[in-house]
């Protein structure tokens, strides 16, 4: 039987070099992995800032927040890929870049929504100011309306009006039933109810106002809610 020749051992300097190369490559891979984890944390931080800035703006902005939630799910999937050593650094970087672009687009959409909201608020303030100026010129007419309808409107501060009803309580026609309407945001809010009403009733009436913008119907229903409370 023919005996195969034995290969000579590698020179010691080559063996040493290969070991050093393994160490260097391991360190480089660990640094890259740490950078990926840091990048993920940076993306999450940006998303968190977006979420904080977008609170209480409008339904349109909420839809963008839902989009951000979807992006978080995608980032979570990337996290699993990092932990399981799946995928490549190039692919992760590409997908991360795509997510950053989408986050920036969501931010721009939020900024645009916020700008439109500010414009609407500015317009509403001008409208309120016009009403107040007109009311000064029409004091006799207002006094007549107050006496006829048993309702008056008082300016509280910017973006807030106080509505006062009388002639509701058959035992005390002078008794006042009042609330403050806050118009600072896109959706109206009712505050400082005197006397207090059932919260579910108020939410229902205000919800209809915000969806229909039918202000006369709103006044009719909130007045009726006060009358119903007297009978309870």
Swiss-Prot record:
**UniProt source species:** Yarrowia lipolytica (strain CLIB 122 / E 150) (Yeast)
Which protein, by its recorded name, is this? Probable kinetochore protein SPC25
Family to which this protein belongs: Belongs to the SPC25 family.
Domain of life, per lineage: Eukaryota
Q: Which GO terms describe its cellular component?
A: Ndc80 complex; nucleus
The gene for this chain is SPC25
What the protein does comes down to:
Acts as a component of the essential kinetochore-associated NDC80 complex, which is required for chromosome segregation and spindle checkpoint activity.
The organism's lineage is: Eukaryota, Fungi, Dikarya, Ascomycota, Saccharomycotina
**Where does the UniProt annotation locate this protein?**
Nucleus; Chromosome, Centromere, Kinetochore
Instruction: Kindly give the InterPro entries that the UniProt entry links to this protein.
Output: Spc25 (IPR045143), Spc25_C (IPR013255)
Instruction: Name a single GO biological process.
Output: chromosome segregation
């Amino acid at each position: 039987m023919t005996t195969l020749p034995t290969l000579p051992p590698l020179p010691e300097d080559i063996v040493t070099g290969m070991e050093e190369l393994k160490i260097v490559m391991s360190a480089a891979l660990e640094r890259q992995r740490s950078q990926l984890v840091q990048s993920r944390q940076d993306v999450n931080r940006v998303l968190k800032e977006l979420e904080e800035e977008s609170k209480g703006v409008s339904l349109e902005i909420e839809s963008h927040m839902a989009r951000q939630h979807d992006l978080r799910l995608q980032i979570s999937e990337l996290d699993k890929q990092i932990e399981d050593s799946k995928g490549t650094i190039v692919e992760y970087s590409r997908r991360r870049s795509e997510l950053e672009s989408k986050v920036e687009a969501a931010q721009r959409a939020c900024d645009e929504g916020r700008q439109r909201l500010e414009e609407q608020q500015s317009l509403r303030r001008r409208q309120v100011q016009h009403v107040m100026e007109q009311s000064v010129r029409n004091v006799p007419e207002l006094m007549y309306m107050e006496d006829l309808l048993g309702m008056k409107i008082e300016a509280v501060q910017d973006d807030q009006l106080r509505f006062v009803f009388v002639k509701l309580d058959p035992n005390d026609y002078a008794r006042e039933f009042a609330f403050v309407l806050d118009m600072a945001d896109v959706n109206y809010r009712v505050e400082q109810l005197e006397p207090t009403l059932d919260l579910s009733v108020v939410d229902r009436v205000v919800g209809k106002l915000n969806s229909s913008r039918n202000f006369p119907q709103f006044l009719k229903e909130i007045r009726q809610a006060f009358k119903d409370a007297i009978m309870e």
